[in-house]
Amino acid sequence: MIIRSPEPEVKIVVDRDPVKTSFEEWARPGHFSRTLAKGPDTTTWIWNLHADAHDFDSHTGDLEEISRKVFSAHFGQLSIIFLWLSGMYFHGARFSNYEAWLSDPTHIGPSAQVVWPIVGQEILNGDVGGGFRGIQITSGFFQLWRASGITSELQLYCTAIGALIFAALMLFAGWFHYHKAAPKLAWFQDVESMLNHHLAGLLGLGSLSWAGHQIHVSLPINQFLDAGVDPKEIPLPHEFILNRDLLAQLYPSFAEGATPFFTLNWSKYAEFLTFRGGLDPVTGGLWLTDIAHHHLAIAILFLIAGHMYRTNWGIGHGLKDILEAHKGPFTGQGHKGLYEILTTSWHAQLSLNLAMLGSTTIVVAHHMYSMPPYPYLATDYGTQLSLFTHHMWIGGFLIVGAAAHAAIFMVRDYDPTTRYNDLLDRVLRHRDAIISHLNWVCIFLGFHSFGLYIHNDTMSALGRPQDMFSDTAIQLQPIFAQWVQNIHATAPGVTAPGATTSTSLTWGGGELVAVGGKVALLPIPLGTADFLVHHIHAFTIHVTVLILLKGVLFARSSRLIPDKANLGFRFPCDGPGRGGTCQVSAWDHVFLGLFWMYNAISVVIFHFSWKMQSDVWGTISDQGVVTHITGGNFAQSSITINGWLRDFLWAQASQVIQSYGSSLSAYGLFFLGAHFVWAFSLMFLFSGRGYWQELIESIVWAHNKLKVAPATQPRALSIIQGRAVGVTHYLLGGIATTWAFFLARIIAVG
């Protein structure tokens, strides 16, 4: 038996009025830093102001104060999110054709933006069907609103106003919990209470209330909509909630109320809590009854999880105990000390959260098309492409952010004197083996994946198709992926006897779901072309990981610069007189990692866009013949680099290049402008600081000559500022170019 000292009671403690509210203070730029508050001597001041405004570590070393600032900033972030949501719902209420779309989602496109004719730009208002002219949107909000049971623009107005009220509340909370009642450090470090509340409250009750909404409001309203009832005739949401008989007409077991629940006769609820799998043939989305069932199940799991951790009652898990018990025969001290790291370094905590959230976001991207959750989402190809691309980019950025904050943790918060032989220490001690092996893997993947393409290009150029790697010559079939597909396709009735359909049509099985003559989803065949591009994915991901991981593992020291920790997170070089030590800071690794993240995500979204247009998306005739958008050309065209350039980039860019004079012309302008932003970045990435300083001195001389010299001395951007401006424009330009290219193409042909 383990004898424990009695747990200290958790007391909720706050400091009253710790920081006075002062508008004069806030109005003084740089008030958070003694140096910056003095005002500008040189133009570097404005850059430092932006760099340090949110770097709370640089304002104070007091962990409690830092925690309060972060906590308060989170409320500000939530306020912005509510404001943005309110704007989306307001546009749906004020400027959209939502009610028309609801009545005929297969023939009318979603639009929630009408351009005002100020300088003749009303050409952008294209005909989206049903006599409505506006910009076609691809955010998926209409499909989400339908799934929620929203049937009128008035309901959207009310929701928009509600979100505004919440935005104001969040702003108030951010002020209140910093200036009026600020929590003490112990409150931020009480992880068991935090886990219980977040798991049971946010995730558990959140999922439960959503399940309740779906059962009582969404399901009945969608039943009526699917049956073709005019949205204006459908009872209002509160009528379903207050009047059980209304629901009982649609789902007879509702008449029995909660009796089946308490008598454990749960199968009575199988009418509206189903386990069907597959897609609803009417809407092309997952069965809403499956989704309600899922949220109910998730709610139960999280409500249980939210009661697992030990607080005032002396029962349950203690996180510290779990972590310290977590060691194997080969892992030394295991996770000992991790509890202290994660409760005193918010960078370490944030790093883990970003890595997990980034990975989850990428998983979401892949599920949005393979298991489309909302009605009429699968046949809205523009929205499908946008949702995939959006979630892939966001996931990529979050994962790079994870590496950034892991490196900041290593530099600012890691204390090597107290860490010995735990897992982190062991990883750091054999970092050379890790990085050199990873480097070897990158070289192998790079040469072999690219080599397969170069082989194909060469054979194609020499007119020897029989010697190419392709489905019709030398086959390189992705046998493991096909095996995984097959397992899932055959699971219903075999390994998953209760399921009627496999989790996704993409696995195989031959069935196809089409809505209004358009393909929603069908089994996705994988072949040699996918095998080739998959290895490019493996290559780009491994290089990104190599750069980011090297930055983290060598953030404090390296053979080249043993005292790197003293130089901080970002520094240009190890001082004058030590050549060859530039661009080694942890910040520089994040900078380089961003470019490879961009490479990796670009290949993924290009692969997705072409594969779906070639093998999935298209129309179906009355005889059941499917005609794909690009006629299945992916398998034969994408096996050469030339094919990617000719049949994907060039062929599909025709819509954006020829968009002038049409409602898609804004995409043509964006395509051009974003290319320009991208090219502008190269000016910052390819030229050095001295070049600009020389030029500036010359310009300052001219100003002095004319007696118009400014009081603030102009300075060239520092090396790091220049690289930051460069990578920002590189990514912004690249992403906006891709966005214009994708949307002009898919709106024109989809």
From Swiss-Prot:
The answer to keyword Transit peptide applying to this record is no
Localization recorded for this chain is: Plastid, Chloroplast thylakoid membrane
Cofactor: binding details: P700 is a chlorophyll a/chlorophyll a' dimer, A0 is one or more chlorophyll a, A1 is one or both phylloquinones and FX is a shared 4Fe-4S iron-sulfur center.
Q: Which UniProt keywords apply?
A: 4Fe-4S, Chlorophyll, Chloroplast, Chromophore, Electron transport, Iron, Iron-sulfur, Magnesium, Membrane, Metal-binding, Oxidoreductase, Photosynthesis, Photosystem I, Plastid, Thylakoid, Transmembrane, Transmembrane helix, Transport
Its Gene Ontology cellular component terms are:
chloroplast thylakoid membrane; photosystem I
Write out the residues that bind chlorophyll a.
683, 691
Q: How does it sit in the membrane?
A: Multi-pass membrane protein
GO biological process terms, alphabetically, are: photosynthesis
Q: Which domain of life is it from?
A: Eukaryota
Record: residues binding [4Fe-4S] cluster: 573, 582
Pfam family for this entry, one: PsaA_PsaB
Family stated for the protein in its record: Belongs to the PsaA/PsaB family.
What is this protein's record name? Photosystem I P700 chlorophyll a apoprotein A1
Q: Which organism is it from?
A: Triticum aestivum (Wheat)
